[in-house]
A protein has these predicted regions:
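Short amphipathic alpha-helices and their capping/turn segments at secondary-structure boundaries
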Residues: 1-4, 100
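Alpha-helical substrate-recognition element adjacent to the catalytic core
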Residues: 3-90
Length: 157
């Protein structure tokens, strides 16, 4: 069974919060590329989902995909792909749905901090609404969302 995590990096693995290192030039040095500025604890949560589901990552971020892909690969994340760069939210939805259809994906989730999430859900077909998981850009990928994603990808809900 092929499982995919469509990942928007900004707001999911890097967050907007004064209490985190994302906003400073000094990052946690787990990821040496300053442009990526991913929070290590958020990346570990993504790693948990992948380890527990055997899902592959498809980057949907309009945010420095080249260095993000390189840094994730350097940290042993495999099976990386990406959608076209810098898609607006309507094109992103269509891009995801086309990718799912063309690649015969069995299960997928979308981790995105899109601010107009209700409008997105209006555009998504009913059978896929649970696959779109709203992320609060000030918290990023939480433990609760990680567990939900794990259960969804493994047909436990």
């Amino acid at each position: 069974m092929k499982k995919i995590i469509f990942l928007d990096v900004d707001g999911v693995l890097n967050i907007y919060s004064e209490s985190y290192k994302t906003n400073s030039v000094d990052n946690d040095n787990k990821f040496p590329e300053l442009i990526t500025r991913m929070e290590y604890h958020l990346v570990k949560r993504l790693e948990f989902i992948i380890d527990m589901t055997d899902a592959e990552i498809v980057l949907i971020s309009g945010w420095d995909l080249k260095s993000t892909k390189r840094v994730l690969k350097q940290n042993n994340f495999k099976h990386l792909d990406k959608l076209k760069e810098k898609l607006n939210s309507n094109d992103r939805i269509l891009g995801i749905l086309n990718y799912v259809k063309q690649n015969k994906i069995d299960k997928f989730i979308v981790l995105d901090d899109e601010t107009d999430f209700e409008r997105i859900l209006e555009l998504v077909p009913k059978e896929f609404k649970n696959s779109w998981i709203e992320i609060d850009f000030s918290e990023g990928l939480t433990n609760k969302i990680s567990l939900y994603a794990f259960k969804l990808l493994n047909d436990l809900i």
